[in-house]
């Protein structure tokens, strides 16, 4: 609750491992708030949140992330002045917050992993380009690749196609399906574009006001 305003009430949902599940609902219905609660950003007042059978509702964000539960955002969280490879390396769960330490001695296999994932999302040719110079759609793909660097078991995607050129949407749909099928990652997707969610999701939950 926020100052007496209850954001998510009487919600019960189960996301089956290995599936793509959609989450829809009108603006203000609490979809993003639910995501923030699942990953530990917002504490819950009561109820339970379990991941792989483990109660996670009282765990901090970094601990939940290390368990393999990650999310992306409506507005991308990238480092605009760093190039794509550097963004990938700094997002890795084993990275120190000190940039000099991260980039002074990088294991070859980590760089190769970053390059392979950038190739997977179609950004290999732009790997040395500053992230701030990418289009918004390309930044979304970079953020997806950054999440994949940490090998999540489950990924929460908050409107992955919002603000993207319609001609690029099919490519993003295809890549998300490949993330699920090739990497075995469970996806929970907030999306307002019903065409997208119908193509992606096997099951869909709807939040009402």
Each language-model region and where it sits:
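Catalytic Walker B motif of ABC-type/P-loop ATPase nucleotide-binding domains
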Residues: 155-159
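Conserved catalytic motifs of ABC-family nucleotide-binding domains
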Residues: 151
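Conserved ABC ATPase "signature" region
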Residues: 101-126, 174-177
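Helical segment within the ABC ATPase nucleotide-binding domain
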Residues: 170-183
């Amino acid at each position: 609750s926020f100052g007496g305003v209850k954001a998510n009430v009487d919600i019960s949902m189960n996301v089956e491992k290995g599936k793509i599940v959609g989450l829809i609902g009108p603006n203000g219905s609490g979809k993003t708030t639910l995501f923030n609660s699942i990953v530990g950003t917002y504490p819950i007042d009561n109820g339970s949140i379990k991941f792989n059978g483990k109660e996670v509702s009282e765990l901090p964000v970094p601990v939940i992330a290390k368990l393999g539960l990650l999310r992306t955002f409506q507005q991308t969280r990238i480092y605009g002045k760093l190039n794509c490879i550097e963004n990938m390396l700094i997002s890795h769960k084993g990275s120190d917050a000190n940039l000099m330490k991260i980039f002074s001695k990088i294991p070859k296999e980590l760089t190769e992993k970053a390059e392979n994932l950038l190739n997977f999302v179609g950004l290999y040719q732009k790997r040395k380009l500053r992230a701030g110079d990418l289009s918004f759609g390309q930044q979304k793909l970079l953020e997806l690749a950054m999440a994949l660097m940490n090998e999540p078991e489950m990924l929460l995607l908050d409107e992955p196609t919002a603000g993207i050129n319609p001609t690029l949407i099919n490519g993003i749909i295809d890549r998300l399906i490949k993330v699920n099928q090739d990497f075995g990652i469970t996806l929970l997707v907030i999306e307002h574009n019903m065409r997208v969610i119908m193509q992606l999701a096997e099951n869909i939950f709807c939040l009402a006001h």
